[in-house]
Amino acid sequence: GEDCHVIANTAWRNPPEFAGGPWHCDAGPHVPRPKGVEWDDRIPYPVFAIGAHLLLRDCRRPDGPTAVVPGSHRSGRLAPLSQIEDPDLTYDGRAPVLLEGSAGDVALFVSDVWHRGTTATGGSGRCFLQVHYGRRDIAQRIRPTDVANQLSPDAIERAITTRQRDLVGLHDPYFYDG
């Protein structure tokens, strides 16, 4: 929507021998709840931040793609500590889904969904840019300075419209921006 901006960005390159990572959330849970307290489906679930993986090369099962557990963002909890290494972790009976794709594809997921990099099994590894977009009231993880905004001069020059400048963080700080 119009009320979001880039809150973080990173580049990832996992080698072909990547052993996989634990289940985790990049942010959240944003609406924490104890086990057994489910979300009331009559209320739209709020999205505070999303992650985007911009694939720089094809990413298939042998490359160790990101896996997500569908619906886990609605749990209000982190993945159970006793299962963070379990590749078959489920939530509400739903098994993990691999975010496979071709170079140039973008995989989007809610930042508080349980996800992990899977074990590479003979491919070339993962290679992607990761961008997190958050609601405007969520502070950017990379803070601008007087000298640099973590953007190249060319990128700053291309941000022409107010919306483009807001999206990449070229805006006056709000309360939570520090």
Regions of interest found by a model, annotated:
Residues 25-37, 81-95, 125, 144-149:
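Short, surface-exposed loop/helix-turn segments at secondary-structure junctions
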Residues 1, 57, 109, 134-136:
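Residue-level marker of positions within ordered structural domains that often coincide
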Residues 9, 14-15, 26, 33, ...:
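Surface-exposed loop/turn and secondary-structure junction residues enriched for glycine/proline
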Residues 79-86, 106, 113-178:
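Non-heme Fe(II)/2-oxoglutarate
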Residues 1-67:
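Conserved double-stranded beta-helix
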Residues 14, 69-76, 132-138:
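Short edge-strand/loop segments of extracellular domains
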Residues 45-51, 57-116:
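Double-stranded beta-helix
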